[in-house]
């Protein structure tokens, strides 16, 4: 299990990303618009820099929904390889059987 504080920190980051996503997208669109004046684009980049650091989606890290483990994460299932193995062994994932050859 991951530390509770790390899982809580990640949830807080997810909330910040969701809160500022629209504002970030709007500012990035202004910055990347070559038709606007350079001064206006520069002001937009300063506003973007003033937003909270944790509101950037790049700072998010995928974590297992069951254990909070940050490594060996399967995106489709949203769980780690260890949680997948445990669930598969106990028969809680339909169609998953232990392989033998």
Curated annotation (Swiss-Prot):
Molecular function terms from GO: rRNA binding; structural constituent of ribosome
GO annotation, biological process: translation
Keyword Ribosomal protein on entry: yes
Cellular component terms per the entry's GO annotation: cytoplasm; small ribosomal subunit
Pfam family of the protein (one): Ribosomal_S14
Gene3D superfamilies: 1.10.287.1480
InterPro entries membership: Ribosomal_uS14, Ribosomal_uS14_bac/plastid, Ribosomal_uS14_CS
Keyword annotations: Ribonucleoprotein, Ribosomal protein, RNA-binding, rRNA-binding
PANTHER family, per database record: 30S RIBOSOMAL PROTEIN S14, SMALL RIBOSOMAL SUBUNIT PROTEIN US14M
Quaternary data: Part of the 30S ribosomal subunit. Contacts proteins S3 and S10.
Record-stated family: Belongs to the universal ribosomal protein uS14 family.
Its job: Binds 16S rRNA, required for the assembly of 30S particles and may also be responsible for determining the conformation of the 16S rRNA at the A site.
Protein's name according to its UniProt entry: Small ribosomal subunit protein uS14
Name of the gene: rpsN
């Amino acid at each position: 299990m991951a530390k509770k504080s790390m899982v809580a920190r990640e949830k807080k980051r997810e909330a910040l990303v969701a809160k500022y996503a629209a504002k970030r997208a709007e500012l990035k669109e202004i910055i990347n618009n070559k038709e606007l004046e350079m001064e206006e684009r520069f002001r937009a980049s300063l506003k973007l820099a003033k937003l909270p650091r944790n509101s950037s989606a790049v700072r998010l890290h995928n974590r297992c929904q069951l254990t909070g483990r940050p490594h060996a994460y399967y995106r489709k299932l949203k769980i780690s390889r260890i949680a997948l193995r445990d669930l598969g062994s106990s028969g809680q994932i339909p169609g998953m059987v232990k392989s033998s050859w």
